[in-house]
């Protein structure tokens, strides 16, 4: 993989010449630059409670996660969630082998339409997302108690003022997000 990662932010007023040059680099096949659409990301951050000024100053961390520099505690790999496995569980009435892991939502032979499958899948997803959030919350509490990260907290806005580490929710913005996988691009 090319390192360091290189990315650009684009919007409706991005100069054509700049986009043309970025596409020339992309054509080399190295996966760079990654392109991030301000017209999607800024409203999405505002929808999560980020001020417009902070949303406009977002940067990308990790692979693809937008956050506000010096203001965000983002645990972006909080879990790896296999959504294809949830489909398998759905098609087997909540079972994997002989173990009942999810709720009983009907055997696949009883489904008469794609809507039936989707309704069962939605129930399974609700069940597993609930348990995923509960598990992530437990880890959040353990991190706050056992790994407060004082040096990092001193570098993130509002932690000192609030008297809380980043692990305790001291940052202005606190996000936890699992990675969904098992899906085709």
Residue ranges and their predicted role:
Residues 1-185:
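Conserved catalytic cores of very large enzyme subunits
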């Amino acid at each position: 993989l090319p390192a360091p990662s290189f990315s650009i932010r684009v919007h409706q007023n991005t100069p054509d010449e700049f986009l043309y040059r970025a596409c020339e680099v992309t054509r080399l096949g190295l996966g760079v630059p990654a392109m991030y659409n301000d017209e999607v990301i800024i409203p999405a951050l505002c929808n999560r409670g980020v001020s417009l000024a902070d949303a406009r100053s977002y940067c990308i961390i990790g692979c693809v996660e937008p956050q506000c520099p010096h203001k965000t505690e983002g645990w972006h790999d909080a879990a790896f969630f296999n959504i294809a496995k949830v489909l398998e569980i759905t098609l087997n009435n909540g079972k994997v082998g002989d173990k009942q892991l999810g709720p009983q939502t009907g055997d696949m032979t009883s489904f008469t339409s794609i809507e039936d499958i989707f309704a069962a899948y939605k129930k399974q997803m609700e069940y597993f997302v609930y348990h995923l959030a509960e598990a992530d919350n437990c880890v959040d509490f353990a991190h706050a108690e056992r790994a407060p990260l004082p040096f990092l907290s001193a570098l993130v806005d509002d932690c000192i003022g609030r008297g809380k580490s980043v692990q305790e929710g001291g940052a202005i913005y606190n996000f936890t997000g699992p990675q969904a996988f098992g899906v085709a691009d």
